[in-house]
Amino acid sequence: MPTQENAATLEAVERFNAAFNSHDVDLVMDTMTQDCVFDNTNPAPDGLRIEGAAEVRVFWEIFFSANPDAHFEVEEIFAFNDRCVVRWIYRKTKDNHPWHLRGVDIFKIRDGKVAEKLAYVKG
């Protein structure tokens, strides 16, 4: 049986995912804390750490502009206390062809918002 905290954590991550798929930067940022941390998957091998809402906002603005059809599909999601793991497929058009990538995000939730989003990919 899911606990109340687990349910709240899942709800926060589901709000983030819906905001991401809407490409609305204001909605995305409404789901994140002011001191949020986002570890992106690029550049390899370790990705780029982006800290603070202002910097994360700039990242999302550039990202959605460069990836107008970006979409995440959740394959599996589970929460434990303030942590959530999402296994996903990221789809977009690349070089005029459908393209996808599989990965995992590890979220930390605080006060109903994303405080950390750590992204990892296959390949």
Predicted features and spans:
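A short gly/proline-enriched turn/hairpin at secondary-structure junctions
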Residues: V37-I50, I62-F64
